[in-house]
From Swiss-Prot:
It comes from Campylobacter jejuni subsp. jejuni serotype O:23/36 (strain 81-176). Its EC number is 4.2.1.33. The gene is leuD. It is an enzyme of class 4 (lyase). One of its GO terms (biological process) is L-leucine biosynthetic process. The lineage of its organism: Bacteria, Pseudomonadati, Campylobacterota, Epsilonproteobacteria, Campylobacterales. This is 3-isopropylmalate dehydratase small subunit. CDD domains: IPMI_Swivel. Pathway: Amino-acid biosynthesis; L-leucine biosynthesis; L-leucine from 3-methyl-2-oxobutanoate: step 2/4. Belongs to the LeuD family. LeuD type 1 subfamily. One of its GO terms (cellular component) is 3-isopropylmalate dehydratase complex. Catalyzes the isomerization between 2-isopropylmalate and 3-isopropylmalate, via the formation of 2-isopropylmaleate.
Amino acid sequence: MQKFIIHKGIACPLEYANIDTDQIIPKQFLLAVSKQGFGKHLFHDLRYLDDKESVLNMDFNLNKKEYQNSSILVSFENFGSGSSREHAPWALVDYGIRAIIAPSFADIFKNNALGNGLLTIELAKDEVLGIVDELKKSQDKNIEISLLEKRVFFKDKIFSFDLDDFHRICLLEGLDNIALTLKHEAQIKAYEKNSKSFLV
């Protein structure tokens, strides 16, 4: 998992509330078990005008020239609602999204996202609306995020956010669940060696 310490990138506003996991990655693309390859299907029904993904919907912000190569999304409340599919953060990360800013997230999506290196940042609704409004007006679409300081820097404004210490450390060190387990491999092996074996 890629470390997240400081990131600066183009931010794209998605002015929708209650974006659910089926909108993020529709069910017909969930057959694969690898984390790679889902990015091209991200927001399929919003990004494309046809099922073959050959005609882009140019009214959708991610398809607009000024938001190409976006690595930050700014959206509205309850982002990631719906089913618990982990493919949703996989698709976002595979596309190149490093962080999402919103007033609130669905709990399961938030945990899945953080566990896959995708930073979820909760700001007050009026702060999010202000950022979205400024992104739409300004030529400079870049936002800087410091996980070390737990701050978002945009234009002349600074926004503070909270994140629990466990997920913050995992993101700073680039530790997913497997890497976190392997970090304690020596202790696990010592425990197994010293534990009694029981035969059934």
